[in-house]
């Protein structure tokens, strides 16, 4: 991880393939090969995306024989994004939003 943990998380989330990997992992663990099979890109490209997600602390990996199994590190994502939101949004706005009372933006 870098000296800017939030920065590494946002950089990792900036890529749509990495966001899709996280969404694919939301229901549970997947092997690297299972993840790669879901995308029309090369295995080495998926490996690089997984490496970036791992470096940002957004996925965990474990070995199962010769397979590498990945899962979402949801608490890391929640803490980082929650910390960022609380730093840039007024507390009252966050409280209203959590209660479902946030004003809806006007659509023109």
Predicted ranges, named:
Residues 4-44, 66-77:
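N-terminal helix-turn-helix DNA-binding core of bacterial DNA-binding proteins
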Residues 1-5, 74-108:
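Amphipathic alpha-helical dimerization/coiled-coil segments
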Residues 54-64, 71:
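Beta-hairpin "wing" of winged helix-turn-helix
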Residues 20, 49, 64, 68, ...:
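Positively charged, low-complexity intrinsically disordered regions
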Residues 37, 48, 54-55:
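Alpha-helical residues within the helix-turn-helix
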Residues 29-30, 54, 85:
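Residue-level detector of secondary-structure transition/capping positions
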């Amino acid at each position: 991880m870098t000296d800017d943990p939030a920065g590494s998380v946002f950089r990792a989330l900036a890529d749509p393939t990495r966001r899709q990997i996280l969404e694919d992992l939301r229901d549970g663990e997947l092997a690297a090969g299972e993840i790669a099979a879901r995308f029309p890109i090369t295995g080495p490209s998926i490996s690089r995306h997984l490496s970036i997600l791992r470096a940002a602390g957004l996925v965990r990996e474990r070995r199962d024989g010769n397979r590498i199994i990945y899962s979402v590190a949801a608490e890391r994502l929640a803490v980082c994004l929650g910390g960022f939101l609380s730093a840039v949004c007024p507390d009252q706005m966050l409280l209203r939003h959590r209660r479902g009372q946030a004003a809806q933006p006007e659509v023109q």
